[in-house]
Amino acid sequence: MESIVDLPAQTDRTANDHVSAITGGYVDPALTAIFDGLRETASEGPSPVWSVLNDSARLRAVYDTGLIQTGPHPEVDQVVGLTIEAVGIPYAALNMITDVEQVHAAIASRSGEIGEQRTYPLPDSLCVYAVVSGSPLIIDDIADHPVLRDHSAAQSGVVGAYIGIPISDDAGHAVGTLCAWDTQPHHWSSGEIQIMTDLADVVKNVIFDQ
């Protein structure tokens, strides 16, 4: 399996460093590589991004959760609902990333209104960035993000602020993210980031029966 480390290297950062780097005009080369890689075609040759996404062991871990095939899981739904209350944000989801699409395994909104669309192409996913990099993606204001301001979620106004914590099995294969977002900019505090990280651990334990 070709790793994301074959992309431009990311240094280790604390939660606050992530926020500072992403909102302060810093252009993360790994994010740029993923953004470009998701738009490459097969004719352009093998890409480290697609090597991660297409890895057979990672895909086996995705499907072994059963969330792609069977849909809603009561305990996962409960954690995702709790995420909205704990972080105080309008939307939260557990999104699984296959080799072709993002799938809502669970989604909740503060208003109770949820769209019918359950799957999205990977170029339209934000969660795929956390899965490929293996690191949280934290965005205070996507309109000011040096890379992702051109993302479809930003252009459509669906996402103003976003946080996605990757969820991996014990072998380190990232299968998806626990994420939360707002249509407006939002500063993610260190406390909120820690809450999301803790809840992602809960989801991991549920879906991998730990």
Predicted segment positions?
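Short, basic/aromatic recognition patches
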Residues: 76-81, 149-155
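A short, aliphatic-rich beta-strand micro-motif
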Residues: 160-169
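A generic "structured core" feature
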Residues: 126, 169, 193, 197-198, ...
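Short coil/loop residues immediately preceding or within conserved phosphate-binding loops
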Residues: 89, 162, 175
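Sensory beta-strand/linker motifs that couple input domains to effectors
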Residues: 171-182
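Intrinsically disordered, low-complexity terminal regulatory regions
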Residues: 2-121, 193, 198-199, 209-210
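Regulatory loop-to-helix N-cap segments in sensory/regulatory domains
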Residues: 181-198, 207
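Regulatory sensory and allosteric helical modules in signal-transduction proteins
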Residues: 91, 97-105, 112-154, 160
